[in-house]
Amino acid sequence: MKRTAARELAIQLSFAAAASGAEPAELLERFFDREHYETLAAEQELCAEYPDDNSLEYIRKLTGLIAENRSEIDGFIERYARGWKLERISHTALAVMRCAICEILYMDDIPAAVAINEAVELDKNYDDPDTVAFVNGVLDGFMRGEFPSEEKE
C-alpha cells in the first residue's frame, strides 16, 4: 500500500475516532479485521489492498499521535484559522489538518512540504475548493508561524 493511501485511511480513522469518541486502538482493531476489511474492499477502492505491516504501523502511529496530542494540534488549528472556531470547520478538513500538523510535529521522517501537499491533495477528495484553500492557508500559516526560519523542505 502506498503512503498516500495509508495516510488517507489514517485521516478517515481519525475522523471516525473524533466523531464517535472511540479509542483509536479499538477502532483500528475492528477496522483492520481481515473479514471486515474485505467487505470494505468491495465498497471503496481505497480498501482494495490490505495494508502491509509498514502501512499498518504508520496508520497506528499517526492515529495514536493525533489522539494523544489532539488538544495541542487543535490549538494550532485555532490559532492559524483566524476568526474560525473548530466547530465551524468541516470535520474532514479538521481531520486532514490534524494529520498534517501531527506529521510535521511528531514524525521526523516526513518532510513538512510532503505532509502539507498530501493533506491538501487528499482534502480535494472530500471538500469543496474553498475549504481546500482554507486548509492550505491554515497549514501554510502554521509553518510560517511556528517554523519561520525553516523552508518547507
Question: Locations of the language-model features?
Answer:
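N-terminal interaction/assembly modules
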Residues: 1-153
